[in-house]
Every structure is written in structure tokens, then in C-alpha cells.
Amino acid sequence: MPEIPEQLSMFEPSESYGEAHSGAPTVPRIVQTSVDFAELLREIDSADRIAFDTETTGVDMTRCDMVGMSLTTHAGVGWYLPVEVTDEGWRLPAGSADALLLCDALNRSRAMLAAHNAKFDIGVLRRHGMPITHPVYDTMIAQFAIDPFARGALGLKPLARQHLGWDMQEIESLIGRSSAGRQRSMRDVPLALVAPYAAADADATFQLVDALQSQVHALGLERLLYEVEFPLIPVLVDMELDGVAIDLPYLAALSKEMTARLHAVELEIYRVAGRIFNVASPQQLGNMLYRVLGLQVDISADADELPSTRAHRLEELRDKHPIVPLVLEQRELAKLLGTYVDALPALVNPATGRVHTHFNQAVVVTGRLSSSNPNLQNVPINSVNGRRVRRAFIGAPGNCVLSSDYSQIELRVLAHLADDAVLRAAFQRGEDIHASTAAAVYHVPLAQVTPEQRSFAKRINFGIAYGMSSYSLARSTGMTDEQADQFMADYFKRFSGVRRWLNVTKRQMMRDGFVATMYGRRRPFTEMRSRPTSEVRRAERLAVNHPVQGSAAEIVKIAMIRVQKALRDGGFQTRQTVQVHDELLLDVPREESHDVRELVRREMEEAVRLSVPLKSGIGMGDNWDAVK
């Protein structure tokens, strides 16, 4: 790290650190002596609620250093504990033993612990020798459950302004803005300025709990938060800190091969086109396809507008000209190289040799987890090249990769929610649900269902869960509109419970202005009666999908919580590493593989009790691709 004087020289003296105030009515108290620390411990022991926050040198909990910790035990006062970082680790000013005393006091406290974006703070503390095992109330996750469309205003400062009327100090006033190339570390800011800022963060979190809890109760979100979201936080902390192993030599070889193939494909595109153009430019590609080569698609467009060059449109043209499959391959190779093959090595943490993705609980409206830096939930599986990327995800030395994938979880949730007797019976008999659906709508014995019939039934099964219309079915399968209408009619005649549930859900959306998942996660809909028909239809599709996808996401999260507890209680060294929608990946020592296989199957299939059985498929191999 550069010397501090060199960093400070970037600022004029008058603008070095901003003003010495937090913008909040919080009295800061700094722990500087053993007497101060003892008083803080007494307050923790007698507190009903404790809010905490960490100050760090960065925003990546797997790499940053801790600068300090703030705590509030009653409104209006915030304690700040500066941290000293040494070669041996870290310690509070009064000595390293104090950190253990503080950790013990928090974990044995009968108080509610609260934090804003708790996953980050718990992860930072764990990395610095303070594992918080006490349940933690996360005000950010609570706010997201209350209003899933407030994603841009989930930060502590906006919420304090909204709920408390505070105009809090922004961190940029202390460390500068990264976009201006003038940002320093929080470690370099004087204690007299850090303390009030940090104390206010803890105090704001403390007081936000009261502001949010009334809404949590009014909206019936207690089960969602206390049984699903809050217990999941330490599981995600473990997964992020553990990371996933990457086969770097394999990626290096794959990069050379894919890069060579990419160049060859681009040269072939230019040869077929008869000229060089920018394949990555939608405008230039559209001009080549639709004007120069004269390809036509079945859409209406203004004379001056070019049809789309998005993937779904190009797929429709795949057999119309030899340039189209080449363009699709070029796109896939370029994306895989830029997003994974060449990007993953740069994301490997040099201290651990692993990639540490970030799992996000407050992004997807239905409650599904998302991941970022890198996004491991979009690694392709349905193409040869995509599966080759998956081959780079491996176990630790001596370990294997275990994948447990829920079988048709969203359709099982649909059968449960709709209480459809025919669909439930098919699952309870263990039938191939897509073949069973095909037999029902095509009026043929189950044994005589053809692969094509099963494929159509599969599309409608999954499409129903996403609110698909007969028009969409026709577009996605090549059916005529009349055939699609008849197919849907036959489907709903057989599965009348599904039709009834769809209609009830749509009416609820219009009447109540929201729909909810099994554990109460709501998706609100603003007054729909005055909206255009197209907007109402789109809202109906979202309303149908939300309880299905959201409930499935809750089941997966509960399974993750159960698997983690069972692994810990059993003393296993196996670690969960990646979650992709309805699939869990684990890094398993080979000597534990038999026991862990059965443990994971049991915990996933018994995660919740539905009117249909939950089933999971287990695979093991040397890498992610090999488990299938």
C-alpha cells in the first residue's frame, strides 16, 4: 500500500476528509481503554437489541481488512471499536483477547442482533476471528421483502432518510469517489471522523428495526424472514468464504482453443458474407442479414427499421442461410471467453486459490438467489461449449464435486398449489410427468407417447408455470394458432385444478393488488384495472409465475439451511459451494462421498412437506460437467 502522505497529497487540505459529523443524531463513544470496553460488555449483557456494523478497507468480504466495528445497544448512542491489524491478525486496542470476549458476549446474548447487509459484516468478522453464531436480523433483507421493487434504495442511507428522516453522511465524503480516481482507504481516515460515521450506521440500523417490523408484521412476512431468509445468511457466508476451486491449466488450454476457433469462425463469416463487417454490431449484422443477404422473418416492421438480431430471432433463421449458425457460434464463443474462460482466472483469490462469487438475496423479485462477480448461475448447460466451461469447476485436491438437482420442482409446487388431483397423482406414482401430460392431452396410452409428443408436453408444463398463453405456445413450437388453442384446451380439460388455480390467482392479483408465495413473499401490482389490456396480460403472467417460482426458491433455500446444519452436526468437511436455481454443488472429500450423498438427498427431499413428493437427482464427478 502506498505511504499515507502520498495518498493525502491527492487532496487539498480543506477537502481531505470532509466534515466531522455523521448527519445523524447519534452520540458516538469510542472504545479506547479497558474501562470503555468493560462498559460496552455490560451494555451488551443487558441489551434487548444490538445492532452492529463493520468498517473495512473494501467491499469484498473475502479480501478486505477490518478497520473497526460499531455497535448500538440503545437508540441514540453508537460505540466504535477501532481495530489494529498486525502480522498475527487483528486486535482491539486493549489487546487481542478482547476480540474473543466481544464475540462471546454477542453470541451468548439474549438480545436480537441486527445488521444492514448482514452477510457482509458476518463474513468480515468471521475472517477476522469473530464468528457470529447468533441469529441476525438483516434490515436490508427485511426492506426487500416489504418492497421488492426498492432495489435501488436498499442502502442504509436511503432507508434512514425514508424511515427515520435522517440525512446521513455518505462515505464518499470521507474517502472520495472511485470514479474520480481519488478514493482512499477507510483505514487512512482519522479516528475522530470515522467514529461518528460508524456509530451512526449502527444506530440507524438499530432504529430501522422498529420502523420495519410493523410493516413485516402487517404484511405477514415473519415466516419468510425468520424461517428462510435470515437463517440462510450464515450459509451464504460460508459458501462465499469457501469459494469454488477452478482448474486454471484447463482454462488456459481452453482459452487458446476457443480463441483460435473464434477467429476461424469470424473469417468464415466474412468469406460467406463477401466482406468484412463488425459481427458484434447489431446494426451492421442486421444490415448484412436483412438487407445485403435479404433474409426475412415473420414480423411486421417499419420500412426503415431492421428486424432484431437477438438470439431467438437468429434461431428462427438458422436453416435459412449458412451465415446464421456461424454468427450464433461466434456469439457463444465470444461470450464464453469474455465472461468465463478468460475472466475466471483473474477472479481467483490469490490467498485461497479459489473463486468467491457473491450470492444476492435482495435482487430477484421472486426471491430466487442471484450471483455476481462472477455470475455462476448463467454458465450454459445446453451447449457443448457451455459444458466445457463447467468442466473448469472442480473439487479441492482429493475431493470430488457432488451435484444435487431437484427434479421438476416448479411443477411439483404447481401441483401442490393448484391441488390438482390428476397432476398430484402422477407425481405420487413417480411417473414421467411430461410423458403423463402428453398421454392425457393426446389421448394415447402412456407407453405409446412419442418423443415429439413428450417434448410438446414438456413445453406446456413449464410454460404454464410461467403463465404461457396459447399464442406463446404456437410461437415456441411451430404449431398453428388453432393447434395451440386445442392443445391448451385439452390440457386444461385434463388438469382442471390447474385451470382453476390460474384463474383464482389472476383474480387475486386484480382484487388484492398482490400475490404471495408459500412463505408469504409478496409481489405487488399497482392498480391494474385502469391499465391497457397488454399490461394486464403481462401482469397476469407474472402473477401466476411468482407463487410457483418463489415457493420453489424458498424450498431450495430451506434445503441449503438443512444441508449445512446436517454437515456441521455430522462433523463433515464437505462444503456447499454453488447454488444454481434448483441445483446445489458441494465440494466433497472422497471418503465422505457415500455418507454425504445420502445426507444431501435426505435433507433436500425432506426440506418441506408438500402434497407431492420432492425428488432430487444426485451426481458425482471430478468436475461440474462430469456430475451429469
Give residue spans per PLM region.
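Extended active-site and interfacial segments that coordinate phosphate-rich ligands
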Residues: 80-89, 94-99, 369-400, 408-432, ...
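Conserved "right-hand" nucleotidyltransferase catalytic core of DNA-directed polymerases
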Residues: 1-87, 107, 133, 159-167, ...
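Short, basic/hydrophobic alpha-helical segments
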Residues: 39-43, 93-110
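A common structural junction motif
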Residues: 494-496, 602-610
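Conserved beta-strand -> loop -> alpha-helix junction used to position metal-binding or nucleic-acid-contacting
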Residues: 131-148, 156-158, 430-434
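Acidic beta-strand-to-loop metal/phosphate-binding motif
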Residues: 51, 110-118, 401-403
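Conserved catalytic core of nucleic-acid polymerases
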Residues: 187, 241, 349-357, 361-364, ...
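Short active-site loop/helix that positions an aromatic residue
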Residues: 58-60, 69, 119-129, 143-147, ...
